[in-house]
Amino acid sequence: MKPIIEQKAKVVAEIEEMIKSSQAAILVDYRGLTVAEMTELRRKLKEKGAEIKVVKNTLAKRAAHNLGITGLDPYLEGPTALAVAKEDPASAAKVLFDFAKDHPNLEIKVGILENIVLEKDQVKAIADLPPRNVLLAKLLGGMQAPLYGFAGALAGMLRKFVYALEAIRKQKAGEE
């Protein structure tokens, strides 16, 4: 009996580590998906730096309680798979929602972001976000725009100053 308890404790620790080491986690109901469809989903998630693992509800509940995640118990019913985004939560969520459009048997249950349980519509909002690198580019562009404007204003003032000096030089040359 003891080896089984140790084995379950090991699985709980694996689930905890998956959640802790990820940017976000999403619980899905995969009931009705074929092995080929699950393999396709795994491949698509892997391309986006995410992975998916089928978990036992009781062990997932235990892992959630150990991590201090509350409000997850009602969603841990029926077949459950845990998808974790190691890099970009938006990309992983987008893959899941796109896959669910083509495969209605896949149902997104709930998400976990920084140990906070997110409803399906909140996870959908994350999926609708642009990828991380696009957001960073927009942020950087927004930060650089005022600097370019300031540099342009300084260059314009310097240009006017040079033109004024040139006009004074021509005026003095004309007086002599």
UniProtKB/Swiss-Prot annotation:
A molecular function (GO) held by this record is:
large ribosomal subunit rRNA binding
Which UniProt keywords are listed? Answer: Ribonucleoprotein, Ribosomal protein, RNA-binding, rRNA-binding
Q: Which residues form a coiled coil?
A: none
Is Flavoprotein found in the keyword set? no
Instruction: Give the protein's function.
Output: Forms part of the ribosomal stalk, playing a central role in the interaction of the ribosome with GTP-bound translation factors.
Q: Read off the NCBIfam families from this record.
A: PRK00099.1-1
Official protein name in the record: Large ribosomal subunit protein uL10
What is the species of this protein? Carboxydothermus hydrogenoformans (strain ATCC BAA-161 / DSM 6008 / Z-2901)
Q: What is the lineage of its organism?
A: Bacteria, Bacillati, Bacillota, Clostridia, Thermoanaerobacterales
| Name of the gene encoding the protein in the UniProt record | rplJ
